[in-house]
Amino acid sequence: MLLASTDPDRLRDWYAAALDPAESSSVDAYRVLRFGTFHLLIDHRDDVGPKAADAARMILNFDVGDARAVAARMDELGTEWVAPLEDREGSLFATAKDPDGNHVQIVQLSEEHLAEMENLS
């Protein structure tokens, strides 16, 4: 996924601190964060505003192993919450805003919900 930003270094630093990627690097002008098999590329663009105009239109979902720890790191970073961490029948969900105002959801599914999803396929 490619995110455009007027301040890509700030955005990269936030994602790296909040979500602890497996890898953080730069390729040409792109800041690249790897989360498992998913790559988040962050690029500088002059044709976007400093804040997401319609942030609820797209939500980045991150499946995390410890949603409480991720939420705590986000709190330490001064993150604004759209929906704070909540337990939904054993699965944990929270939606935050990154520094550009994009919505970022952290999800930790319970073993029961994971098993139910496996049965659907």
Q: Where are each of the predicted segments found?
A:
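A conserved hydrophobic helix/loop-capping motif in glycosyltransferases and polysaccharide synthases
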Residues: L2-S5
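Conserved active-site tyrosine of GNAT-family acetyltransferases
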Residues: L11-A16, M74, G101
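Vicinal oxygen chelate
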Residues: D20-G65, A71-K97, Q108-S121
